[in-house]
């Protein structure tokens, strides 16, 4: 199961008692700020959660799995996420009892 933006908006509606439309707009606005920062080359740091970074990957050799043909994989910029220590600790604590 995955947490969706709609579920986040519903949670805001239930916990803060704000209008559903406003809650949806808040969630959309939050993610739009992250998108815009990354598009302009900025790192996004969310204290207690983690960091979104941009990383440039060089061109590298690859192989078409169907034909076995060698093909170059283009250089590109990718978004990476590094969870913060608080998030790591909480996830580990939550999962330690499930084994």
UniProtKB/Swiss-Prot annotation:
The lineage of its organism: Bacteria, Pseudomonadati, Pseudomonadota, Gammaproteobacteria, Alteromonadales. GO terms for molecular function: DNA binding; structural constituent of chromatin. This is Integration host factor subunit alpha. This protein is one of the two subunits of integration host factor, a specific DNA-binding protein that functions in genetic recombination as well as in transcriptional and translational control. Heterodimer of an alpha and a beta chain. GO terms for cellular component: cytosol. Residues 49-71 are annotated as: Disordered. Signal peptide: none annotated.
